[in-house]
């Protein structure tokens, strides 16, 4: 399990974009950049993730801290919001700013953790069941159904959709289907040696 955890964090630690997909299908897919970079000074498995439109990469529409860990022989990615998150916008491009993020800045997001399973050399994650991962979108409360798949070839596929908590009707999300990202920058060399040693225990 520790080897899988290490592999998961290594594959997550990257910059991804869906440039080709967006160019091929502009009505259906925005051009999005996803940065996921190790927070080397925090607990093992901690990553800062920013998702932004390529035209405005320093103003992410979503910024979170993820923490990949094992619990009860399961791979789980815990999700945290940041207090005063705007203060850290674009910090994935300036690692020295990432170092200013402290544990006290993190707030656990109830119901939004990912349960991850390994399939061959790929990882498949889904938000925990229960419809409890709530997000306000344009003033309307929705719950997220979110899935991702990471491959050992540097590919990432994601699907996020928001639903009405009462009727379960889909209110937002991809109409064209899965977003297909490719790794453009590898940040895995930034993973601290002590994390790797901790995972071996």
Curated annotation (Swiss-Prot):
Gene3D superfamilies: CpcT/CpeT domain (2.40.128.590). InterPro entries: CpcT/CpeT, CpcT/CpeT_sf. Its EC number is 4.-.-.-. CDD domains: CpcT (cd16338). GO terms for molecular function: lyase activity. One of its GO terms (cellular component) is plastid. The keyword Plastid applies. It is found in: Plastid, Organellar chromatophore. Keywords: Lyase, Organellar chromatophore, Plastid. It comes from the Eukaryota. Belongs to the CpcT/CpeT biliprotein lyase family. Covalently attaches a chromophore to Cys residue(s) of phycobiliproteins. This is Chromophore lyase CpcT/CpeT. It comes from Paulinella chromatophora.
């Amino acid at each position: 399990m520790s080897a899988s955890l290490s592999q998961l964090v290594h594959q997550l630690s990257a910059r991804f974009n869906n440039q080709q997909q967006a160019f091929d299908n502009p009505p259906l897919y925005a051009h999005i950049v996803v940065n996921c970079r190790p927070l080397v000074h925090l607990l093992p498995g901690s990553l800062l993730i920013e998702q932004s439109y390529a035209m405005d990469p320093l103003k992410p529409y979503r910024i979170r801290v993820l923490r990949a860990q094992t619990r009860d022989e399961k791979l789980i990615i815990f999700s945290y919001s940041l207090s005063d998150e705007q203060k850290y916008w674009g910090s994935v491009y300036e690692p020295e700013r990432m170092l200013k993020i402290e544990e006290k800045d993190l707030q656990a997001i109830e119901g939004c953790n990912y349960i991850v399973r390994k399939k061959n050399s790929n990882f498949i994650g889904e938000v925990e069941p229960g419809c409890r991962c709530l997000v306000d979108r344009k003033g309307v409360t929705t719950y997220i159904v979110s899935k991702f798949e990471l491959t050992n070839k540097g590919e990432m596929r994601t699907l996020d959709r928001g639903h009405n908590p009462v009727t379960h009707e889909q209110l937002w999300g991809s109409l064209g289907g899965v977003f297909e990202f490719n790794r453009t920058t590898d940040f895995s060399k930034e993973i601290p040696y002590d994390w790797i040693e901790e995972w071996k225990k």
